[in-house]
C-alpha cells in the first residue's frame, strides 16, 4: 500500500492515500485470511530509522477508516516480525514499520556524513527473502511507488501477484487518457524544475494537442525562448539545455505550447510580500520572483481548458500555499471543474495539485484524483 501521507505534529494531515486502499483491504478480509500484512514507506529516511518518518501515526486513521483494530510492528523484516506474522489469526491486520528504514528497500541511501552509499547485495537478498516470508500472496495497491524498482515492489517472490482496486482504477484512467483520449487533449504542467518533468513532457508530446506550462519551470522555457529577464525566479540550468529539444518535438508533433505572458511577482516568498505584475516586455526585475500567473495568462489558460475534452493536470501554476499567489491555480481548477461538468474527462495528479484540489474541496468535482503524487 502507499501510506506515504503528510503528517503534522504526529497526526495524519491528509488521509486520501489511506482511504484509497480501504476497498482492497476490505475485499481481502472478506476471504477470511489468517492474517493481512500491510507494508509501505513514508518520507525519505535514507535507509535509517528516523522517528518522524515512522508509520505509527498512520495507525489511528487506518483503524478509524477500517472500523477495526490494527496491530503495529516496530520493524518490517527479521525473525521477530516473521514470528509475529506467523502467529496471526482470525484475519488480524498487521501494519509494518517504514520499509525505507532499511537501505535494502531502495538499494541505496545517504549516510550520516552525507555520502551516497549502496546496499550490500547479500543483505538486499536477505531483506527480500524476509519480506517474502511474511505472506503467501502479493497484492500491490501502491500506485505511487509501482514505477520504482524497490525491494517491496520487485523482490517479493510470490507466484501469485495481484493488483488492488486502487491500482486498477489508476491504470484504467491513465490508460484511457493516454491510449484513447477524447480530443482535443490538453495537459497542464507546473512545478519547479524542467529536468524533473523531462520524461513526462516527452511522453505527453506524443499524445496531446495542447500543453500549458506554468509554475516555476515556465521561467526556464521563457529564458531560453525570449532571453527573458527573470529576476530571482526559479531557473533550472540542467533543464535549460533541453528546452530547444522539447520545443522542436512539440513543433514536429503539432502540439501547441502555452507559456505565461504575464506574471504576478513578489519581492519575497512570504504572505506579506509586496506584489507587482510583470510581462514578457518588461521582464522581471532583480530582487523579484515570479510566483503566479498574471491576469492575461489566467484568461488565456481558461480558453485552452474550455476547448479541451481530455485534461490531465500535474503541477500547480504558482505558489498557491500563499493566498495572494493562489489565483492562477485556483482559477484554473474552477475552469477544469466547469469543463468536467460539460463532459470533459479530467485527471489530477502530483502531490501539490492534489493538495490544491482537496483544499478547494473539489475531489468529487473532477473525474479522477490520482494518489500517485509525482508518479502520476
From Swiss-Prot:
Its EC number is 2.7.2.3. InterPro entries: Phosphoglycerate_kinase, Phosphoglycerate_kinase_N, Phosphoglycerate_kinase_sf. CDP binds at residues 191, 196, 215, 315, 320. Monomer. This is Phosphoglycerate kinase. The keyword Amino-acid biosynthesis does not apply. Pathway: Carbohydrate degradation; glycolysis; pyruvate from D-glyceraldehyde 3-phosphate: step 2/5. GO terms for cellular component: cytosol.
Amino acid at each position: 500500500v502507499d501510506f506515504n501521507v503528510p503528517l503534522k505534529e504526529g497526526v495524519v494531515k491528509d488521509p486520501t492515500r489511506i482511504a484509497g486502499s480501504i476497498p482492497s483491504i476490505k475485499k481481502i478480509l472478506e476471504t477470511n485470511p489468517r492474517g493481512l500484512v500491510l507494508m509501505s514507506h513514508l518520507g525519505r529516511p535514507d535507509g535509517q530509522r528516523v522517528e518522524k518518518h515512522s508509520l505509527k501515526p498512520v495507525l489511528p486513521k487506518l483503524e478509524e477508516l477500517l472500523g477495526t483494530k490494527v496491530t503495529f510492528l516496530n520493524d518490517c523484516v527479521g525473525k521477530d516480525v516473521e514470528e509475529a506474522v506467523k502467529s496471526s489469526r482470525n484475519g488480524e491486520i498487521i501494519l509494518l514499520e517504514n520499509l525505507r528504514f532499511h537501505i535494502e528497500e531502495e538499494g541505496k541511501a545517504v549516510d550520516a556524513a552525507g555520502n551516497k552509499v549502496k546496499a550490500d547485495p547479500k543483505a538486499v537478498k536477505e531483506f527480500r527473502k524476509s519480506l517474502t516470508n511474511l505472506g503467501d500472496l502479493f497484492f500491490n495497491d501502491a500506485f505511487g511507488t509501482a514505477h520504482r524498482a524497490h525491494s517491496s515492489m520487485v523482490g517479493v517472490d510470490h507466484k501469485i501477484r495481484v493488483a488492488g482496486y486502487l491500482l486498477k482504477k489508476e491504470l484504467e484512467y491513465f490508460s484511457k487518457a493516454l491510449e484513447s483520449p477524447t480530443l482535443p487533449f490538453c495537459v497542464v504542467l507546473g512545478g519547479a524544475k524542467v529536468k524533473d518533468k523531462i520524461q513526462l513532457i516527452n511522453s505527453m508530446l506524443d499524445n496531446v494537442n495542447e500543453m500549458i506550462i506554468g509554475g516555476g519551470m515556465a521561467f526556464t522555457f521563457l529564458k531560453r525562448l525570449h532571453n527573458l529577464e527573470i529576476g530571482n525566479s526559479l531557473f533550472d540550468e540542467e533543464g535549460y539545455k533541453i528546452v530547444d529539444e522539447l520545443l522542436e518535438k512539440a513543433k514536429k508533433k503539432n502540439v501547441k505550447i502555452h507559456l505565461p505572458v504575464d506574471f504576478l511577482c513578489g519581492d519575497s516568498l512570504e504572505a506579506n510580500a509586496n506584489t507587482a505584475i510583470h510581462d514578457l516586455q518588461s521582464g522581471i526585475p532583480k530582487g523579484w520572483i515570479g510566483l503566479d500567473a498574471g491576469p492575461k495568462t489566467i484568461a488565456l489558460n481558461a480558453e485552452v481548458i474550455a476547448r479541451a475534452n481530455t485534461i490531465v493536470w500535474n503541477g500547480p501554476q504558482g505558489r498557491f500555499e500563499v493566498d495572494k499567489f493562489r489565483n492562477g491555480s485556483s482559477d484554473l481548477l474552477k475552469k477544469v471543474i466547469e469543463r468536467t461538468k460539460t463532459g470533459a474527462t479530467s485527471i489530477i495528479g502530483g502531490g501539490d495539485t492534489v493538495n490544491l484540489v482537496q483544499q478547494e474541496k473539489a475531489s468529487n468535482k473532477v473525474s479522477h484524483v490520482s494518489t500517485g503524487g509525482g508518479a502520476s
